[in-house]
Design a protein with these regions (language model features):
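Juxtamembrane intracellular "pre-TM" segments in multi-pass secondary transporters
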Residues: 1-13, 191-231, 416-418, 424
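Helix-loop boundary and gating motifs at the non-cytosolic
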Residues: 2-57, 218-270
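Residue-level signature of transmembrane alpha-helical entry/exit and packing/kink sites
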Residues: 11, 100-105, 225, 229, ...
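Substrate-agnostic recognition of the 12-TM MFS/MFS-like secondary transporter fold
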Residues: 13-30, 51-67, 71-86, 103-163, ...
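Structural signal for membrane-spanning alpha-helices in multi-pass inner-membrane proteins
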Residues: 34, 87-94, 158, 162-163, ...
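C-terminal transmembrane bundle of multi-pass solute transporters/carriers
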Residues: 51, 58, 69, 73-75, ...
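Transmembrane helix-loop junctions in multipass membrane proteins, especially transporters and channels
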Residues: 95-99, 124, 131, 163, ...
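Hydrophobic alpha-helical transmembrane segments
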Residues: 101-112, 138-196, 261, 268, ...
Length: 430
């Protein structure tokens, strides 16, 4: 399987394994920070997660700008070391009995903002680490499955660890995982793109940042399909949040007459479907990425329809697993398009735009769901969302066919800089 063959490349295997550990560490951090925050400040403690999400949203576009300006290896190393120090301060404060809510709010702010710099730098570095498009596709599948593995492994590890470790040392584990990630990035340094591969333009101040953001938006606008894809990403993120994040817990309680256990099973089934689809998408040769994206959306919608077609837990589990198959069909080809059809010195900005759109839409979806389910039943709400998701896939496919038949499709050609950079990256790996 091509998906597993990627692990034969030491640089990719080392990076992926370190990111799995880092993601598991993040899961432990999330458990500990919410527990301490609520224990110290009651319901006000939920502000911690809101602050972290808000920081990632506010600094998302800015992170993409600097991921394209600076040496990406240096960015990731620095961010991991800073996150290790910041998170590592919490167990020290807890040990001396000095941990307060404002400490955790500051840490959440820093972790969220630093993550918005690390993620685009990582995504923009993958084309350099992969030797060809097929390997890059498989590497994207590996990275996409990372957080899903963390969700699966995290809960199973948390219980036994709490028997032997005080909860505050979950912060310690996360800090150590950041150091492991930094060590891996240091070791694969020669495979990562040096600073001359990043943006050659240098701007100062707010005007420079706005200019770089404008350049990133222009790259999206010039692409024949990315503008429509990004609009659909917003719609899908809103509707997915309404249907799954908000709708499924209500559906399990009101229509399946079940508690948190049933909800956990449905979420688990979704995780299993995601992982299976990731393995498949990382193993096959993707000839038509746009078709895969549109098919993925239809599959997600059909899965949601299946989930609520009858008030039955087995059917809900089957529908959840089926819907999950569509996620990687959408995500992995989109990452491949960004990484191979956008000039290397703009990948960070385009990726951060995608990430910011997704996070904004999910926040909006949560707000809409709070009102929507007061006026319509949960199954009807999920059905409406499913139909909207499917319409983005069907409508997108029809739009692509129309552009191709009418001759309005603009071919995407690598820029001169893109070709030179890819050739240099391959030669540096030999």
């Amino acid at each position: 399987m091509q998906f597993l063959k990627v692990l034969r490349y030491p640089q990719l295997a080392l990076l992926w394994s370190s990111q799995v550990l880092s993601s598991i560490g993040d899961f432990f951090y999330a458990i500990a920070v919410m527990w301490f925050a609520i224990r110290i400040a009651g319901s006000t403690g939920v502000m911690v997660s809101a602050v972290e999400a808000g920081a990632a949203l506010v600094f998302g576009l800015l992170g993409g700008v600097y991921a394209d300006r600076w040496n990406r290896r240096t960015i990731m190393l620095t961010v991991d070391i800073l996150r290790a120090c910041v998170v590592g301060s919490l167990p020290v404060l807890a040990f001396f009995g000095q941990l307060q809510l404002w400490h955790m709010l500051v840490v959440a702010l820093l972790v969220g903002s630093l993550g918005s710099l690390f993620d685009p730098a990582l995504q923009a570095s993958l084309p350099t680490l992969a030797q060809d498009t097929r390997t890059l596709q498989a590497a994207n599948g590996l990275m996409d499955v990372t957080r899903r593995l963390a969700r699966a492994l995290g809960p199973s590890l948390a219980g036994p660890l709490l028997v032997v470790l005080p909860l505050q040392h979950f912060f310690t584990l996360d800090a150590v995982s950041f150091l492991i990630s930094a060590g891996a990035i240091f070791l694969i340094g020669r495979h990562l793109s040096p600073s001359e591969y990043t943006s050659k333009r240098r701007h100062d101040g707010v005007v420079g940042i706005l200019t770089d953001l404008k350049d990133g938006f222009q790259q999206i606008r010039r692409h024949p399909y990315l503008p429509g894809i990004f609009v659909a990403v917003f719609v899908i993120a809103v509707t997915w949040t309404i249907a799954f994040t908000a709708g499924i817990p209500l559906y399990a309680e009101r229509y399946l007459n079940s508690g948190p256990g049933a909800y956990g099973l449905i979420v688990g089934a979704y995780g299993v479907g995601n992982v299976i689809s990731n393995f498949v998408m990382g193993s096959i040769k993707l000839r038509r990425p746009l078709a895969a994206i549109m098919l993925g959306r239809v599959i997600v919608g059909l899965g949601f329809l299946l989930m609520v077609c009858a008030p039955s837990l087995p059917i809900a589990l089957l529908g959840s697993a089926c819907a999950a198959l569509g996620g990687p069909l959408d995500d992995i080809p989109l990452m491949l398009i960004i990484q191979t059809e956008i000039p290397p010195h703009h990948i960070g900005k385009v990726y951060s735009t995608y990430s910011t759109i997704s996070m904004s839409a999910m926040a909006l979806g949560g707000l809409i769901a709070a009102s929507l389910y007061q006026y319509v039943s949960v199954p009807i709400g999920i059905v409406l969302c499913a139909l909207l998701i499917m319409s983005t896939g069907i409508g997108g496919a029809l739009h692509i066919q129309w552009k191709r038949k009418s001759g309005k499709e603009t071919a995407v050609h690598p820029t001169k800089d893109t070709v030179i950079i890819k050739q240099e990256c391959r030669s540096s790996q030999q």
